[in-house]
Amino acid sequence: DEETYVKLQSQFIKRTIKKRYVALLDGILEANDGIIDLPLRVDLDDRPRQLVCYEHGKPAQTKWEKIEVRNNQTLVYFYPITGRTHQLRVHASHELGLKTPIVGDDLYGSKANRLHLHAESLTFIHPVSKEELTITTAAEF
């Protein structure tokens, strides 16, 4: 119903919903965690690609942590603070970010059978019961 929709939408707008993504990166990260703060805007000459732009980009922040390294690839958690288009993909691949694209990212890295980025967990306040609710689903990689 409309009231439920508005209550859920409000949580997204206020950025109170907690999101956790898991990604497999094409390389080895030395650091264990951090925050990436790179403003993004659309690449007008190459849509839908996004690019880092300090002059005209919108703020984009991503918290991340390393889970494990295996077969010259790094499994990480991403916790987006903002929610820009392609934010996690650009923050992973960009030279000022992690410099390590997501496996299967044909826009910012190299092609594979799939993009190895998965929304693993979503936590929010139930609009009716007011209880904190977490929905999780494991990645298949």
Could you say what each language-model-derived stretch is?
Residues D1-F141:
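RNA pseudouridine synthases
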